[in-house]
Curated annotation (Swiss-Prot):
UniProt keyword list: Cell membrane, Membrane, Transmembrane, Transmembrane helix, Transport
One CC-aspect GO term: plasma membrane
Family: Belongs to the EamA transporter family.
Keyword field contains Membrane: yes
Protein name: Chloramphenicol-sensitive protein RarD
Location relative to the cell: Cell membrane
Membrane topology: Multi-pass membrane protein
Stretches that traverse the bilayer: 8-28, 34-54, 74-94, 104-124, 126-146, 147-167, 180-200, 212-232, 241-261, 271-291
Amino acid sequence: MRISGQGVLLSLAASVLFVTLPGYVHLLEPLDSLQVVAHRVVWSIPMVFLLVVATRQWPTLRAAWCRLFAEPWLLACFPLTAAMMLLQWGIFIWAPLAGKTLELSLGYFLLPLAMVLVGRVFYGERLTPLQAIAVACALAGVLHEFWLTRAFSWVSLVTALGYPPYFMLRRRMGVDALSGFVFEMLFLLPLALAALYWLGDESQAFREAPRLWLLLPMLGLISALAFGAMMASSRLLPMGLFGILSYVEPVLLFLVAVLFLGEAFRPEQLWTYAPIWLAVLLTGWDSARLLRKQARRGI
């Protein structure tokens, strides 16, 4: 599978959009994490339909809708992928509010290693020498963190191991990123509405924080753009490269946690993150080199 410049840019854009959320959710107080997740689902639906209109994807969405009912196995798979995504959304919203953004970032540091393993074992993808060095650097950093803490956070574990089956299943389903996101949101909508009803009247929260009327729709817009970009990149890139580029997100998460959310970073942890930052630089260099080769060959 060739390297797509568009896929690389989409992956980077998704990472930047996603890492705005840990700080963003603090602006949504006094809503709690469950309320924020439910609102994220509800407000993502109109925003993703606006995205469909803006990108003129109605024919694609209509074709995917027809295929959904023509192939019953797809109809059975979407509730499963929706549940997988809801789990990750819940952790991503809850962790910053619980002061666990650094643990979340460690999970995202582990995720690309899992994705590279998936690419190698299930798709027969080979790593370039620089990619192999990048993975080794990242693995060294992760192992140092385990040695340092003598513990394994469940937040990190669920984040690292939850996404690979999701990406594999979505790739197997062969539904475009935007249509798949629409279907998953529609499957989650009844659950989100039920959660908001069960959690009770929110009028007091909106009176205390009128900004919620603007911030909640914006949450849906950020979610729609970020997830659409991520899924599009996952289909345009080889699984291994897609996994390695995912290191950009935890680096940014780390910076948000330390610089903006005030989470503690001990000097000895530098030996965890320095090899991982080196892995990111090597990956970017290797991706640029491969893209230049393709351009010279006219691919």
